[in-house]
């Protein structure tokens, strides 16, 4: 399985979220709501998640092996590094941000 497209929107918020991302796998399957997060060890890609009633975040979709996780990370960060435009986003909040996983 390969990442065949990355759509990324850098955003300016008060929180640690730096971009919202959608990826396409094998030109056949799209995953929305990935995020680029500024963690204590630098930027990382967070998978789409939802907050559970006890306040924890649980991934909705995620890779099941380290090779696929690295491919997603590399593809997203390549586009992130190539994207200059930062959009102020009034709708993006730190409410859906995870704790540092990196």
Swiss-Prot record:
NCBIfam families: PRK13259.1. Keywords: Cell cycle, Cell division, Septation. This is Putative septation protein SpoVG. Could be involved in septation. Belongs to the SpoVG family. SUPFAM superfamilies: SpoVG-like. GO terms for biological process: division septum assembly; sporulation resulting in formation of a cellular spore. Residues 83-102 are annotated as: Disordered. The keyword Zinc-finger does not apply. The keyword NAD does not apply.
